[in-house]
Amino acid sequence: MEIPETGDMTTDIRPDLERRRQNQQDYVLRTIEERGVRLVRLWFTDVLGRHKSVAISPAELETVLDEGLQFDGSAIDGFSRVQESDVLARPDPSTFELLPWADPSEPSGTIFCDITNLDGTSFEGDPRQVLRRNVDRARAVGFEMFCAPEVEFFYFADSGPVPTTLDRASYFDLTTTDVASDLRKQTLHMLEALSIPVEYSFHEDGPSQHEIDLQYTDALSMADSVMTLRLAVKKIAMDRGVYATFMPKPLNGVQGSGMHTHLSLFRDGENAFHDPAKADG
């Protein structure tokens, strides 16, 4: 089946989308004023999935929400060449959250951005735009895309050249002096404050290896949530003098970390792959 491009399906729903965006934008600006936010961090990723951030003052946010923030894309690996360098970071107001780890005396917020060309077209090097385009193509033929990842990572005592694990535990193990378990608990509280629901977390099979499983949601929101989770895990570990890493194989002879991702397509609120005539569904 040929799936239409995004541009073939937006005409009828564009006014509703613009109205929804304006309502979300108004909510963001009102929240910033009411909560006394002093700094807003604009987040996006490069083509390798590295987290990028630009900080602006609340006074600049309304203009940036309307017009985007222009920056030199050639300074970011894989984005653009010098001769065609300028791109726009356009905040998605639906992703705004207050940062729970910010100094209470100086509240900060964060918002994910789409990267576009100066003419407003999608920038091909922006992973979020690539995902959005494919989500829209699936929606055009009646499908909603959902996913739920199992995020695995290691905690080490420091960031030195020889990794030192915090424990010798294995799958589902728990000890009364489990420092890493406490780090996971703090991370879950942080994710809850960021409106990211967690299904469960536990010690994985390898020493000092852990897993956090997020509750399934739409693919674009989940991509943002995974980026936020990675930052939260590292931030909380760093505050305790511990080093967290998501690299796939940090220890020789020990199973590595992955991110199993459960994908599903729904049509009219029903699982498109469910077959009630089959015993196993």
Give short role names for the model-derived ranges.
Residues 2-281:
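Glycine-rich, acidic/polar active-site loops that bind/position phosphate-bearing ligands
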